[in-house]
Amino acid sequence: GDGIAAVIVEPVAGNMGCVLPVDGFLETLRRETEKHGTVLIFDEVMCGFRTELHGAQGKYGIIPDMTCLGKIIGGGLPAAAYGGKRDIMNRIAPDGSVYQAGTLSGNPLAVTAGLETLQMIRTIPDFYKILEEKTKRLLDGWLDAAAEAGVAVQVHQSGSMFCLFFNDKPVLNYEDSCACDGKKFKAWFLSMLEQGIYLAPSPFETLFMS
């Protein structure tokens, strides 16, 4: 109602493993926020440009009122950005009364690196299709290895974002992620490390194909 100014959500969660939105979740958020005049903000710091060129909002077809993006827009250099619909962004100075600035805003090196990265992405034919196929090939290999070892796993993927859960049930939220087998993850992590493959040391981290 009138007491809720904004709803902010990761359209693809990235800090409890890679947890995908269930069917209808984002659509319901969009419908209800529009109904009550509440601003819908997508935190695409992790999924922006990783799920596809237009981020998770492009992949799932849900357009928020505002979007937050992280260092991926700097081509790996420290950078961040936010944007939104005209009526919201017009409130930012100098057009509006909300002042936002900093000594690192618009850093030339980070902005140049980010621009070059985005131009490369747009010019490489089938860039995201290739990236997604590479990710799927890796996950298919993990599934085959797990089946051969008799270990129950779930793999999640959205574009180039992915992770593996040691669980025999679907992982739909934080509680499901916490219920996964941490001992099996630790054994898997150490086994991979012994083979010269360094992964994030936490089951709550999302991995990215490059």
Task: Give residue spans per PLM region.
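Conserved N-terminal phosphate-binding loop of PLP-dependent enzymes in the Aspartate aminotransferase
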Residues: 1-210
